[in-house]
Amino acid sequence: MSRHKSKKLIIEDDEPKQDELNPFSFKEFIRNKNQPSCSTEATEVYNGACLVEQDYNTSIDFATKGPFFTDPSALCQPPESEPDETWIESHQRSAIEGSPDFELCGASDISAYSEQSSLCSDEREAAEWELGQSDFLPKKHLSRISTGSYEGDEETSVIDISFHHKRGNAENGTKNLQQLREENSLLRKQVKELVRMSETDSRRIKQLTDEMHNKKLQEEKEANDLEAMVQSVEQNLQLMTKRAVKAENNISKLKQEMLKLQGQLEDYKSENERLRLGETAALATMRHNAQVASEYLNKAAQDAEISINSC
């Protein structure tokens, strides 16, 4: 932030008597302002030339713990650390807003930056309390009455210009402080938002990590189950192979036995056929013998009947 440097009225010490005699000198103005008999809205007339209206709010200085009247010149003089803090905050803000890929590096950097911002805001608030701008600014301006003394009018006008310039600088300082507060609050909001986004991303990353770990465990379990199944299938295949070999051996043995049985069956068939043929011949012979015997018996019976009849 740019600071307007107040113009200071330099009074030479070569003419002390002229300053003491001149009621419009800056020293006389400061001396009369710091007198304890000053009251609110008190009007003093110096030689009928200048009308000065004083209306200053008395307050307590937190550094000296006593009542005092604030010198307006102190209002336009910012603390020595304030320009550095202003430059640091403006530089940080420009660095943050200028980089589109700004990301939160870590919770430690964010906490350090937030602590630095809070310290800067506390120092500015302390400087504001020490300055007491809201309580020590004059409520009424100096009004000048035109006189015939050219020197007094010129010096009074210089005092008015210096006072108005200092007051403008004080107002600019107030505006700059207000702008710095707004920038600080905006930066805090951005930091809080980034912290919130970081926490959300951390929770999401943790959730995805847990899901990936669970999926890995499930895949390992499925792989182990599949491996066990493959091993059992291999064992079953080996058993089936052994059984198939054994069955082939049994089949070969059965084939040999079947061939033997077929040979025996052929033998039995031929023997049965032979026996059947021999049986048929015996039956035919027996039938022929029986027929011959029956013929002999018939002939003997006829001969016996004839002999019986002849007797």
Curated annotation (Swiss-Prot):
Q: Coiled-coil intervals in this record?
A: 167-278
State the Gene Ontology BP annotations: cell division; cell projection organization; positive regulation of cilium assembly; positive regulation of protein localization to cilium; regulation of cytokinesis
GO CC terms:
centrosome; ciliary basal body; early endosome; midbody; recycling endosome
Q: Where in or outside the cell is it found? A: Cytoplasm; Early endosome; Endosome; Recycling endosome
Give a yes or no for keyword Coiled coil in this entry.
yes
What are the entry keywords? Cell cycle, Cell division, Cell projection, Cilium biogenesis/degradation, Coiled coil, Cytoplasm, Cytoskeleton, Endosome
Against InterPro entries, the record matches this protein to:
ENTR1 (IPR026757)
Q: What does this protein do?
A: Endosome-associated protein that plays a role in membrane receptor sorting, cytokinesis and ciliogenesis.
PANTHER family registered for this protein in UniProt: ENDOSOME-ASSOCIATED TRAFFICKING REGULATOR 1, ENDOSOME-ASSOCIATED-TRAFFICKING REGULATOR 1
The record's family statement is: Belongs to the ENTR1 family.
User: In its UniProt entry, what is this protein called?
Assistant: Endosome-associated-trafficking regulator 1
Where does this protein come from, organism-wise? Answer: Danio rerio (Zebrafish)
